[in-house]
C-alpha cells in the first residue's frame, strides 16, 4: 500500500531519526506517527488533516504545519491550491473538501480533570506525621526526633525500625510522599520540617472530623530541657508565607464527630495509597457544626526572621538547653565496621558488657570508631559527649597514610568540634620501611591537631582502655552535674563550626554538646558537600598538601575560583609561584614553602 503523503512521511522520518540521537525517550512517539502516516493511502491537503490518524496529535501536526508553510514559501507554491489534483482521494464533494482543507481542524482541548487532594490512610505514617506537625504553631519547624516523638502514638507502624522482616520501610518513609505532594516543607541540614499552606489546609479540614488533629504543643515540649521559653522563630520558611493572627482565630465544634477512614478489611494500607475520601467530601460532613474558618491573615517578611539565626554576630536568640547528668545513662557506641566477625563481638561487646559492666551498643557511626552518648531517661534523647576514639592497627595506619584517608579523617575529627580525640594504635605486623612514616604521623597528630595517642599491645588491651575511659568520662560529667546542649533547630551544617567558635569565645570553660541525631547529620559523609569541602579535597590530591595545609589555604581562598582569580591578577609567573608562600603563612606544618607553592600554581594555573 502506497503512502498518500510521501512528503509528510519524509519529514516525520527525519524527526524520528533525530530523536534517536537527541531525545531517545520520544522515539516511540515518532515511530507510531511514522507507521500511521506510512499506512495511510489518503492524500491530505494540509498537515492538520493528519489529526484523524492514530498516533498523530496536535503537537506533531503543528510541527508539520510549520514545516509545510516553509516548504511552500521556499518553492513558491500557493498553500491553498497545492495538491488540488488529488481531491478525488479525499471526498466526492470537491467544493466542501476544499473549504474544509483550507481551515485547520479545530482541536478540542482536553478536559482538565480535577486533581484529587491527597488524604493519608488512618493511623498510617503520613497520617501521624501530619497530625504531629499540626500540633505545633503554624509554620513552626521540628526535627525528625521531635516529630517521631509526637507522631508515634497516632501510628500503628513503628518509626524506629521495620516491624516485619519483609518490610523495607518504616513509618518515617511516608515523609518523602508528603514532601513530594507539597504538604510538608523541608529545609536545612540537619533537616527541619513544617507544614506548607497546602498541608495546613488538609490538616484543617481533617481537624473538623478527627479530634487527633488539634493544636496542642510547641516544639519546646519535646526538647531535652523541657524548656517553655524555646524560641521557635529560629527557623522559618523562606521568602513570604501566610501567617494567621492568633487573636482572630476561633474554632467551635458543636458536637463530637468521629470518622475512621480505613479499608473494609481493617488491614493497614501503605502510606503511598490514597483513601477513597476526597477532602471536599470531608468538608460536606461538617455541615452540622458551627465552624469558623480563620480568615484574618497577614504577610510576614521572613527576611527579617533570617537575622534571628544564630551566627557570628548574633547569638541573642540561641537558647542553650540544660540537661541534668544525674538523669542520664552513658552509653559507649561502637562502630559496626569494628565488629567484623563473631570473634570481634566476643572480644569487644561481650567483654565490655560482661567483664567491665559498660553499657554499649553497635551502630553505624558517621565519625570515629567509638563514641560516648548520654541518654536522657525521661525524653530518650541522646547527647554526644566530648570524647571520641579512632582505633587503628599499624598496618591499617600505613594503608591510610598511603591513600590519604588518615589526613582526611583527622580533618573531619577536627571539624566535629569534639574536644577530646584519642587515637588508639594497636601493635600488628607491618612493613617496617614505614616505621619513620608512622613516627611522623603520630608526632604530627599530637603536636598539630592536639589529639591524644595511646599505644596498645592487642585488641584486649584496647577494650580495657575503652572501659577505663568510660569510667573516667562518667566521673568527669558527674562533677559538672549538667550538660549544655545546643538545640537541634539552631544547628546548620554550614554555620555549626563558627557557632561553636563563638560559644567558646563567650564561655571557654563550658563544653557545648549536640544531640546524636544532629551530630550524625552534620558530619555525614553522604551529605551534600560544600564548594569549600570539594576545594580542600582537590588540594589534598597534590602531593605535599596535608589536611592542615589544605585547610589553611581554604581559609585564605574559600573556593577554587578565589585562588584562580588571585593567580590571574598576578603580574608574573614568579609572583604566581610564590603566592601561597606569601599569603598562607601558618605555623609549623601549616606553612606553605616556596617549592610547594609553585607546585600548586603549576597544577591549578599551568603556563600555556
UniProtKB/Swiss-Prot annotation:
Keyword Nucleus (UniProt): yes
Name one matching Pfam family.
MUS81-like_WH
- Indicate the quaternary assembly: Interacts with eme1. Associates with chromatin. Interacts with the FHA domain of cds1, and this may require prior phosphorylation of Thr-275.
| PANTHER family noted in UniProt | CLASS II CROSSOVER JUNCTION ENDONUCLEASE MUS81 (PTHR13451), CROSSOVER JUNCTION ENDONUCLEASE MUS81 (PTHR13451:SF0)
Gene Ontology CC: Holliday junction resolvase complex; mitochondrion; nucleus
Top-level taxon: Eukaryota
Query: Which protein, by its recorded name, is this?
Result: Crossover junction endonuclease mus81
Q: What UniProt keywords apply to this chain's record, in alphabetical order?
A: DNA damage, DNA recombination, DNA repair, Endonuclease, Hydrolase, Magnesium, Meiosis, Metal-binding, Nuclease, Nucleus, Phosphoprotein
Q: Where is the region Disordered?
A: 82-114
| Regions of compositional bias (Polar residues) in chain numbering | 82-93
Tell me the name of the encoding gene.
mus81
Q: Source organism lineage?
A: Eukaryota, Fungi, Dikarya, Ascomycota, Taphrinomycotina
**What subcellular compartments does it reside in?**
Nucleus
Instruction: Output the PTM entry.
Output: Phosphorylated in a cds1-dependent manner in response to hydroxyurea (HU) treatment. This phosphorylation promotes dissociation of mus81 from chromatin which may prevent cleavage of intact stalled replication forks.
Amino acid at each position: 500500500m502506497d503512502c498518500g503523503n510521501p512528503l509528510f512521511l519524509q519529514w516525520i522520518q527525519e524527526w524520528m531519526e533525530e530523536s534517536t540521537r537527541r531525545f531517545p525517550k520520544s522515539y516511540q512517539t515518532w515511530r507510531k506517527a511514522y507507521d500511521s502516516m506510512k499506512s495511510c493511502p489518503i492524500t491530505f491537503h494540509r498537515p492538520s488533516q493528519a489529526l484523524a490518524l492514530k498516533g498523530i496529535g496536535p503537537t506533531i501536526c503543528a510541527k508539520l504545519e510549520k514545516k509545510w508553510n516553509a516548504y511552500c514559501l521556499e518553492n513558491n507554491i500557493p498553500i491553498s491550491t497545492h495538491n488540488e489534483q488529488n481531491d478525488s482521494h479525499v471526498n466526492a464533494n470537491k467544493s466542501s473538501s476544499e473549504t474544509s482543507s483550507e481551515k485547520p481542524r479545530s482541536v478540542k482541548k482536553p478536559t482538565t480533570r480535577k486533581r484529587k487532594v491527597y488524604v493519608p490512610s488512618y493511623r498510617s505514617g503520613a497520617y501521624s506525621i501530619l497530625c504531629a506537625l499540626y500540633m505545633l504553631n503554624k509554620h513552626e519547624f521540628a526535627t525528625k526526633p521531635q516529630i517521631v516523638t509526637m507522631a508515634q502514638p497516632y501510628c500503628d507502624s513503628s518509626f524506629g525500625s521495620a516491624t516485619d522482616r519483609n518490610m523495607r520501610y518504616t513509618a518515617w518513609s511516608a515523609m518523602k510522599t508528603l514532601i513530594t505532594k507539597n504538604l510538608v516543607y523541608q529545609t536545612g541540614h540537619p533537616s527541619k520540617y513544617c507544614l506548607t499552606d497546602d498541608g495546613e489546609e488538609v490538616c484543617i479540614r481533617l481537624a473538623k472530623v478527627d479530634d487527633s488533629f488539634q493544636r496542642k504543643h510547641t516544639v519546646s515540649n519535646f526538647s531535652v530541657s523541657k524548656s517553655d521559653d524555646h524560641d521557635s522563630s529560629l527557623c522559618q520558611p523562606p521568602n513570604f508565607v501566610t501567617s494567621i493572627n492568633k487573636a482572630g482565630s476561633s474554632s467551635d465544634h458543636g458536637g463530637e464527630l468521629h470518622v475512621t477512614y480505613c479499608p473494609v478489611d481493617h488491614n493497614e494500607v501503605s502510606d503511598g495509597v490514597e483513601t477513597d475520601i476526597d477532602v471536599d467530601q470531608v468538608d460536606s460532613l461538617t455541615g452540622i457544626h458551627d465552624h469558623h474558618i480563620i480568615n484574618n491573615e497577614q504577610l510576614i517578611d521572613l527576611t527579617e526572621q533570617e537575622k534571628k539565626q544564630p551566627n557570628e554576630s548574633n547569638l541573642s536568640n540561641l537558647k542553650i538547653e540544660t540537661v541534668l547528668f544525674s538523669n542520664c545513662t552513658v552509653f559507649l557506641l561502637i562502630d559496626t565496621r569494628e565488629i567484623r566477625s563473631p570473634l570481634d563481638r566476643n572480644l569487644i561487646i561481650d567483654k565490655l558488657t560482661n567483664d567491665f559492666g559498660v553499657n554499649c551498643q553497635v551502630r553505624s557511626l558517621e565519625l570515629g570508631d567509638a563514641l560516648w552518648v548520654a541518654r536522657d531517661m525521661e525524653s530518650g534523647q541522646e547527647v554526644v559527649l566530648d570524647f571520641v576514639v579512632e582505633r587503628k592497627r599499624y598496618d591499617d595506619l600505613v594503608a591510610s597514610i598511603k591513600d590519604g584517608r588518615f589526613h582526611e579523617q583527622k580533618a573531619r575529627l577536627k571539624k566535629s568540634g569534639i574536644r577530646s580525640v584519642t587515637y588508639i594504635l594497636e601493635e600488628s605486623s607491618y612493613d617496617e620501611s614505614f616505621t619513620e612514616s608512622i613516627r611522623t604521623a603520630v608526632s604530627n597528630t599530637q603536636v598539630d591537631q592536639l589529639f591524644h595517642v595511646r599505644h596498645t599491645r592487642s585488641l584486649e588491651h584496647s577494650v580495657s582502655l575503652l572501659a577505663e575511659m568510660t569510667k573516667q568520662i562518667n566521673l568527669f560529667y558527674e562533677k559538672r552535674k549538667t550538660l549544655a546542649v545546643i538545640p537541634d533547630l539552631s544547628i546548620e551544617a554550614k554555620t555549626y563550626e563558627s557557632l561553636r567558635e563563638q560559644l567558646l569565645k563567650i564561655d571557654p570553660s563550658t563544653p557545648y554538646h549536640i544531640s546524636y541525631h544532629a551530630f550524625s547529620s552534620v558530619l555525614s559523609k553522604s551529605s551534600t558537600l560544600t564548594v569549600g569541602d570539594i576545594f580542600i579535597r582537590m588540594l589534598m590530591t597534590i602531593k605535599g598538601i596535608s589536611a592542615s595545609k589544605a585547610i589553611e589555604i581554604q581559609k585564605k581562598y574559600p573556593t577554587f575560583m578565589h585562588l584562580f582569580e588571585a593567580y590571574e591578577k598576578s603580574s608574573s609567573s614568579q609572583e604566581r609561584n610564590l603566592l601561597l608562600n606569601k599569603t598562607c603563612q601558618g605555623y609549623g606544618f601549616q606553612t606553605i614553602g616556596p617549592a610547594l607553592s609553585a607546585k600548586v600554581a603549576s597544577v591549578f594555573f599551568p603556563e600555556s
